[in-house]
């Protein structure tokens, strides 16, 4: 039995195209405790699961925010994968929640947008969507690398678990420790930043979500860290 929760980064993405149904189903089959996925808004305000900012539609590349869901659904996400697998289309968050919220212990949703206003629209859409999922408060962790988005999440989705995502001191320098502990249930530093600054980050007293772990030795090293509760990885350990 694992000491911590092992979360599949964009699904089991070493053996399947990331952020696809195939990757999520593989993570379930092989026994990951949960999924990490990025969520963004389409032009027609649908929440989709993707880490990509741009997609090629026809002969032109467009921003995701300029493409409607119906056109995104025409794109085969498995086309560039390292091995030949069945066609995969982009998933809406609703589709993911309907199939994968129940079987996994946790789903980690990273709000990827860089624009504050766009993130607020996404949070509002998310609040409406989650009203229909009884297990959402228990199983979801909502993450952002923008502290204003964290605050807005807490305003619109009270009692949901939130986490601040960061990889440098620059992201922390303008925030007080009290601000962070009052607004976040977790801290989510990347592996290398946490490795260099673990004592400082542990002083916040918040459990750690650590991303992205690469290699068995690194995974085993953090197994004995009492602050680390989640390890995010694309590989099964």
Swiss-Prot record:
Keywords: Hydrolase. It comes from the Bacteria. Disulfide bonds: none annotated. Signal peptide: none annotated. The keyword Heme does not apply. It holds the Pfam family GDPD. Residues 4-237 form the GP-PDE domain. GO terms for biological process: lipid metabolic process. SUPFAM superfamilies: PLC-like phosphodiesterases. PANTHER family: GLYCEROPHOSPHODIESTER PHOSPHODIESTERASE, CYTOPLASMIC, GLYCEROPHOSPHORYL DIESTER PHOSPHODIESTERASE. This is Uncharacterized protein MG385 homolog. It comes from Mycoplasma pneumoniae (strain ATCC 29342 / M129 / Subtype 1) (Mycoplasmoides pneumoniae).
């Amino acid at each position: 039995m694992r000491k911590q929760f092992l979360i599949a980064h964009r699904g089991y993405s070493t053996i399947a195209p990331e952020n696809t149904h195939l990757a999520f189903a593989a993570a379930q089959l092989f026994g990951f405790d949960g999924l990490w996925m990025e969520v963004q808004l389409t032009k027609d305000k649908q929440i989709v699961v993707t880490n990509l900012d741009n997609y090629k539609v026809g002969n032109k590349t467009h921003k995701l925010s300029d493409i409607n869901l119906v056109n995104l659904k025409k794109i085969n996400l498995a086309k560039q994968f390292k091995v030949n697998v069945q066609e995969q289309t982009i998933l809406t968050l609703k589709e993911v929640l309907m199939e994968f919220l129940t079987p996994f212990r946790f789903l980690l949703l990273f709000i990827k947008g860089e624009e504050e206003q766009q993130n607020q629209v996404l949070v509002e859409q998310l609040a409406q969507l989650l009203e229909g999922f009884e297990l959402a408060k228990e199983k979801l962790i909502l993450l952002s690398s923008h502290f204003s988005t964290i605050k807005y999440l807490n305003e619109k989705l009270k009692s949901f678990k939130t986490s601040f995502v960061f990889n440098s001191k620059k992201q922390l320098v303008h925030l007080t420790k009290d601000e962070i502990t009052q607004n976040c249930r977790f801290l989510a530093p990347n592996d290398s930043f946490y490795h260099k600054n673990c004592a400082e980050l542990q002083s916040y007293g918040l459990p750690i979500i650590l991303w992205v772990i690469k290699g068995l030795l690194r995974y085993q090293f953090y197994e004995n860290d009492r602050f680390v509760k989640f390890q995010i990885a694309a590989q099964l350990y």
